[in-house]
From Swiss-Prot:
TM helices/strands, residue ranges: 30-46
Name of the gene: DVL7
Start-end of Basic and acidic residues biased regions: 1-16
Entry's Gene Ontology BP terms: negative regulation of cell population proliferation; shoot system development
Swiss-Prot/TrEMBL keywords: Cell membrane, Developmental protein, Membrane, Transmembrane, Transmembrane helix
Its job: Small polypeptide acting as a regulatory molecule which coordinates cellular responses required for differentiation, growth and development, probably by restricting polar cell proliferation in lateral organs and coordinating socket cell recruitment and differentiation at trichome sites.
Places the protein is found: Cell membrane
GO CC field: plasma membrane
Region (Required for DVL/RTFL small polypeptide activity): 22-53
Keyword Transmembrane helix: yes
Record carries keyword Cell membrane: yes
Region (Disordered) residue spans: 1-28
Main location: membrane
The name this protein goes by in its record: Small polypeptide DEVIL 7
Protein's organism: Arabidopsis thaliana
Amino acid sequence: MREKYTKEEAVKNWEKKKNKPSSPKGVGEFLKKKKGRFYIIGKCITMLLCSHK
């Protein structure tokens, strides 16, 4: 069963989570998930910059 928090406890928990620095492992996991999208965007930018008329 869920516990009920007072407003002060809820604010304190929220501030604790908000100020938590992101870990390098978390950033690596994020980049791993978005790897395909970054690859495609990189290829598109390369084509745009290298196209000559």
